[in-house]
């Protein structure tokens, strides 16, 4: 098979990030320099982001049988790269105080980003599995990066063991689907799995096992038990990546699989997804109420947010594609910037590394009185995650409710409204604590010039985008409408 220049251009983000991995690896081997390796990482990711402009010029195409590059993959590739950039930026000041090797952190983030980019373009079960493993394996190292702390090491081992079990379920599910359909490509699966085949036991068993494997990666109920422990144990910049890039990439590929393979037209599959969605929304929100650890709280809230998104997967079968696709694009963009801001504030408060992160809610008590702008940013992020009007989070929730109503998914829409009402309590609890009287002695605090650091700039840009796109969302909606898959 000969690769044309157009195909090479279509693969530019993947190639640039892959090349950056090699350059950073050689740089570490030549000389350990934290600043140089961080700079190389950020330059590589920025070039990958800029290359999306040229990818758009060559038009949608199947680059290989495993990869399909179109507007859909470009949009989610952009989101994954932005999340990876933010993670690297937050990691730099955190690693300044880290006593061991710092440079490998960037290498692991780049490899995980490579897996995420592959997932957004995956058009085949082989590339889906390869992308998930490429994304997941570096996370074992990243979660346990602060290995001198027992909790970080425990989180890494817990994630590794459960992830291995989930991958085996996913692989076995794929094998059952292949045994029945004779194809591994999404399009081939869609063509061979006709309506009559959907109800065959092997197909349903295969789909069920894939839902188990993917449900773990997306931390959906009942496969979510690892989430709060891992979010709490992982360093704050790694929790940022876990909450954003890994969830966005995996959800993007799941959505593409559901669009091409109508095997999910099965009433049984739709019922299972609906139950998982409602359980995730209620469990995530109810468990977050009692949390005093902000990373655990955001971990539980991410379970609820993925539950809201799962409604779009159910609606794909009952609705034309346009609205579910728009909903997922707008919601994930809002979730990305809100999470980057929230975890960014936690990362800034936890930098430089001094052992445990600033994760207790008590650490943020009275933040407004000595860091008013930072507390304003955190307030905006909490309001956006709660879905309050004038924020981007509200636009995403509005799309989810509108889609649920138009698809006649009344009880799922009711779950969204109920979940949002519960969520409002604990998001406002975090917000109120920022404005209480501060403690006598500060446990952790950000540097006085935090807004001039790269991490501070990322947090401020996220807050501005959440507000501006919350008031005037049309540019984002237009971008999402352009990001349509090549059918």
Curated annotation (Swiss-Prot):
- Major enzyme class: translocase
**Enzyme nomenclature, EC number:** 7.1.1.-
Q: GO biological process: any one? A: ATP synthesis coupled electron transport
Compartments where located: Cell inner membrane
Q: Name one GO molecular function term.
A: quinone binding
List the InterPro entries hit by this protein, alphabetically: NADH-Q_OxRdtase_suN/2, ND/Mrp_TM
Record-linked Pfam families: Proton_antipo_M (PF00361)
State whether it acts alone or in a complex, and with which partners, per the record.
NDH-1 is composed of 13 different subunits. Subunits NuoA, H, J, K, L, M, N constitute the membrane sector of the complex.
Summarizing the function annotation, the protein's role is: NDH-1 shuttles electrons from NADH, via FMN and iron-sulfur (Fe-S) centers, to quinones in the respiratory chain. The immediate electron acceptor for the enzyme in this species is believed to be ubiquinone. Couples the redox reaction to proton translocation (for every two electrons transferred, four hydrogen ions are translocated across the cytoplasmic membrane), and thus conserves the redox energy in a proton gradient.
Recorded protein name is NADH-quinone oxidoreductase subunit N
Q: Which organism is it from?
A: Yersinia pestis bv. Antiqua (strain Angola)
User: Encoded by which gene?
Assistant: nuoN
